[in-house]
Amino acid sequence: MSDRDHWFEDLASHMKDAYLRYSFTKGTSQEVDFILATTGAKVGSLFIDVGCGPGRHSLELARRGMCVTGIDVSQDFIDIAQRNSAAESLVNAEFLRLDARDLINHAPLHAKFDFAICLCQGAFGLMIDDQHDVEILAGIRRSLKDNGVLVLSAFNAYFSVKHHADAEFDALSGVSHETTDIRNELGEVKNVDLWTGCYTPRELRLVFNLAGFDILNISSVEPGQYSN
């Protein structure tokens, strides 16, 4: 585990299970339908879920017969994922606390997986420094077998500029900053800062190519409405 702090850990520690009450988490089944249809994954395929959070995509993939390893920087979220996996006896899902920036140096997970997912700013796009997103992509690339496939979502810079009037968008870095209130299971409110790395399609192509990926497709999607 990296000794580098990540701002998201405090948010996860406050929200815990309440994270799964947020509306953007309700489209998990449809998103997994899309992932399986797009990748052509078969029962028993090996997935890594980078920035898995409390495991909503990992667990759904495991229910469909995939073998999944989820990693996340938040121990609180990993604990939730492990608890829910055990409750459903999903022996084909495992969860590990690991900073996605350190995946590139975590040899036990290298060249192991058929597919990778990194969705809803679980890791990619939660970094304030562009170099960290590059590190994450390089680590994902190293975790995949030859010809492995990554499905990743990133926040659209054009959408952020047009629709996030209350956020501060830094055009030079592509980072959007805003403050918002989050609630935990007890309804306790905490005001927090959010930073989101936003990308144009061209920027995604460039950063993915730097990490050794070939782009197969870029689509505009919304939570629970993934399509090509």
Task: Explain the meaning of each model-derived region.
Residues 1-42, 44-51:
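Conserved class I S-adenosyl-L-methionine
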Residues 54:
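Conserved SAM/SAH-binding loop
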Residues 58-103:
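Class I SAM-dependent methyltransferase SAM/SAH-binding core
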Residues 106-115:
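A short acidic, Gly/Pro-enriched loop at the edge of an enzyme's catalytic core
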Residues 114-132:
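A short SAM/SAH-binding and catalytic strip from SAM-dependent methyltransferases
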Residues 133-146:
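A short glycine-rich, Lys/Arg-flanked "PGG" loop and its adjoining helix->strand segment in the class I
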Residues 147-211:
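SAM-dependent methyltransferase
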